[in-house]
């Protein structure tokens, strides 16, 4: 009967997943029902990333009309690998002086403990990157990525093409026990036999090691997409490549320290499919879709995220748009308040109008419904071919008029001119809504397609998120919808660390003294 091996890992410090400050440790249990010749027992801590990308039919035809054979493009990166021998002990191993003679181990139960150092900060694969390696990160920005799609095998059991293509990228960490048996005396079995047992685990680095560095050319403006242009993004497409109206210029590939990397993440991930040939990027031709490109600006030290399009008003001359103003909407941690006053997320939302003030003040403009979506874009890269996957999570959908409050969410009596007098604005007080002000992000620690909600970027996998705020309006009895996209938003599955001021010591009155009578 074969030996029975079990691996018991010590729990992580936070009780949920292993992080940068943890040391992987545990016990290997070995049960033998009969004597066995064992040369050594090793414990291996390792992690790897793997991607598979495909080329769609339009790329299989060259300019001369010949058909290029299709093939899968695979990429494998070793993120880390550490080995520790637990049997025989060091003093015995050193005394063997290279001898391959095995040990005869009697039947019974044996336990071997192991412990590794803290997880490295950078992946091991960086030393293998060359000038021809095209990656999402530079050497300086590369960090050990979190676990991703560790349950990818379950996706293949589901009749769902979305999950099938989503499983083409994975980051897996494991502890592997390897038992090397003694050499067989038979001439037809001349090699050592290996027995292996594997235990996977979830690893998510500290937030500081998950932060995605901003693109050097995109600090001044963000690309926003209209609801029409991202229609296919709301429900994940079944095709290999989802439709997009962005094309990637060749300037977005840059060589840093001898390694090519994608300089403009946003354009690259939104492109339908990308083929890199001799440093030149060609994007798949897509149908023409109207989109609106909006840029952010600063107002009183706050970033302003405008709606992707303006809505015409009934007088035929005026229009309105929505603006979200925030100082810190680019990063959201789990259990962060989304609409609460002081949250710096959606607590400052304004309706900005252009037109005649007398005409505007007579209109009946009422917010009716609100929907907040979290949009995921996951991109896999392999041998110059990138495939994108889009999906959407509905965070909340609410009827704004279901619960009446003492003060309306939008009071046009408070309309005022903006700082330069060219427009009028009025605050939409979503922070005063009794339900929205209590809403926190990802309170239940939701797993989307088997993965916690976190943004990350590694050599060949990039997972980014954006927020989409949809508001349905009633304007003089006519229903219209506004859309604001915050793209991208850094998402963390950890709870934000709140630095609390140390409480002052309690005041203790000094003792009183009385003179003793002489």
Swiss-Prot record:
Subcellular location: Cytoplasm
PTM summary: Ubiquitinated by RSP5.
Keywords: Cytoplasm, Endocytosis, Isopeptide bond, Ubl conjugation
Location (main, coarse): cytoplasm
CDD domains for this protein: ART10-like
UniProt cross-link Glycyl lysine isopeptide (Lys-Gly) (interchain with G-Cter in ubiquitin), position: 118
Presence of the UniProt keyword Membrane in the record: no
Any GO BP annotation: endocytosis
Gene Ontology cellular component list: cytoplasm
Keyword check for Cytoplasm: yes
Subunit structure: Interacts with RSP5.
Function (record text): May regulate endocytosis by recruiting RSP5 ubiquitin ligase activity to specific plasma membrane proteins in response to extracellular stimuli.
Family to which this protein belongs: Belongs to the ART10 family.
Protein name as annotated: Arrestin-related trafficking adapter 10
Protein species of origin: Saccharomyces cerevisiae (strain YJM789)
